[in-house]
């Protein structure tokens, strides 16, 4: 069983998701050709996203490291990026069976009416395995604690996916879709709180500028493409590169800003037919009861506000991280994942660039402290995995500790981590919160 699921994970999202979507399409009554085409569109989307992400990391890692060296921005925690966190997640006893265990929990929640989300985003299950793996090592390699932490994270993420589904679907015009990805969902509470605070500030509501408004106000300078070129060139200039390389970095960042929306359109092309068929099936067979298909946030990271906020925050957070009291983490490798901060913020800010930027900055600053706090046990887990498997993704350079924005900067991950550190008292508190969330969600589902 363990080898089967390890093999499935090794296929990667670009192969795994087309197979899953083709099977789902056939199960809900789509013709084979249409189901296969939908699945392949999703797979091509993941391939394209991988190419663009590689374009960003390959070309910007060295300039960002050069900036760090030139201006003496070295901090003690080495940014290993999400691949290290995923390596820690899947190279432990917890990660080996995380998919069947979480699918089982999902099934039980569906039949007990404590969720409406069917989480088919199997690739992102590594997030649950990661917090489980950290708990596993914190508690002296206890599988009980590892699976407890993973399941608590999974259940609360499913509930949050349900709670945000209507707002998400309305804002992005994606019927029947929810986002059960804990990294994205953990920014949702910040979006709710700060959005309400902004509305209480006299005159703040007048700063209602979305990405389209930015274009009207600043003309071509408000375009994500042009903003990307400017920020990319500024990074090259700060790294003291020659004019040729500065221009190349500018065009490369601009290309990333332009290509991501086109690639995410492929996800929508693949998902739309399956989503529509699912809603049709639910209406005819299940008396109109709602069912949400849990998907990756990659589906919506091409939104113009997400692109604008991400490209502006990359240099800003790099500068702030150095001078932040008590912070030991300098985000470099993780910056390519900046786009994933915003999918669950935008439905609450309604795409307002100013609100989104401020919320994104605040959550990132808090996230840096979360990463710093989790560093000792992230390092312990990574070292144990590297010693056992030799996986280079988990190798921490000499003289450094290890960390990553995704998933160590997440509110969900940090709260569970801190709960585990409190031992059985923390377990009790986490269990009560989780059960309460399930009860609240069930009451909503039964009422509707």
Residue ranges and their predicted role:
Residues 1-52, 93-292, 296, 302-304, ...:
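Signature of multi-pass transmembrane helix bundles
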Residues 45-96:
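Membrane helical hairpin/interfacial module
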Residues 53-61, 370-379:
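C-terminal TM-helix exit segments that contain a strictly Trp-centered aromatic cap at the helix terminus
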Residues 56, 60, 68, 80, ...:
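Solvent-exposed, non-transmembrane amphipathic alpha-helical segments
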Residues 111-115, 294-373:
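Hydrophobic alpha-helical bundle architecture
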């Amino acid at each position: 069983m363990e080898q089967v699921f390890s093999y499935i994970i090794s296929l990667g999202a670009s192969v795994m998701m087309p197979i899953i979507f083709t099977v789902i399409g056939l199960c809900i009554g789509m013709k084979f050709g249409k189901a296969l085409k939908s699945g392949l569109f999703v797979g091509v989307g993941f391939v394209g996203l991988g190419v663009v992400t590689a374009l960003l990391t390959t070309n910007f890692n060295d300039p960002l490291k050069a900036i760090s060296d030139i201006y003496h921005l070295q901090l003690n925690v080495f940014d290993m990026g999400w691949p290290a966190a995923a390596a820690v997640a899947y190279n432990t006893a917890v990660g080996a069976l995380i998919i069947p265990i979480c699918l089982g929990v999902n099934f039980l929640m569906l039949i007990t009416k404590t969720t409406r989300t069917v989480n088919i985003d199997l690739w992102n299950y590594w997030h649950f395995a990661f917090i489980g793996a950290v708990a596993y090592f914190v508690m002296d390699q206890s599988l009980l604690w590892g699976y407890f932490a993973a399941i608590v994270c999974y259940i609360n993420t499913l509930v949050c996916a349900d709670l945000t589904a209507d707002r998400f679907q309305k804002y992005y015009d994606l019927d029947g879709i929810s986002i059960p990805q804990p990294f994205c969902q953990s920014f949702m509470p910040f979006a709710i709180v700060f959005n309400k605070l902004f509305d209480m500030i006299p005159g703040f509501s007048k700063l209602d500028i979305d990405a389209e408004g930015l274009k009207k106000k600043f003309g071509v300078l408000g375009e994500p493409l042009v903003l990307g070129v400017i920020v990319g060139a500024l990074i090259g200039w700060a790294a003291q590169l020659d004019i040729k390389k500065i221009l190349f970095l500018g065009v490369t960042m601009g290309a990333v800003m332009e290509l991501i929306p086109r690639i995410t359109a492929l996800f929508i092309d693949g998902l739309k037919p399956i989503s529509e068929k699912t809603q049709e099936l639910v209406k005819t067979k299940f008396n109109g009861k709602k069912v949400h298909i849990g998907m990756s946030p990659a589906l919506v990271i091409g939104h113009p506000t997400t692109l604008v906020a991400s490209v502006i925050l990359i240099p800003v957070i790099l500068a702030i991280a150095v001078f932040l009291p008590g912070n030991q983490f300098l985000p470099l490798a993780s910056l390519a994942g900046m786009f994933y901060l915003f999918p669950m913020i935008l439905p609450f800010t309604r795409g307002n660039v100013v609100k989104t930027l401020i919320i994104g900055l605040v959550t990132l600053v808090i996230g840096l402290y979360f990463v710093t706090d989790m560093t000792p046990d992230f390092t312990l887990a990574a070292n144990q995995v590297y010693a056992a498997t030799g996986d280079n993704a988990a190798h921490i350079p000499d003289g450094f500790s290890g960390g990553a924005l995704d998933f160590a900067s997440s509110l969900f991950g940090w709260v569970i981590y801190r709960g585990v550190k409190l031992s059985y008292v923390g377990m009790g508190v986490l269990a009560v919160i989780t059960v309460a969330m399930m009860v609240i969600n069930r009451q909503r589902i039964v009422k509707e």
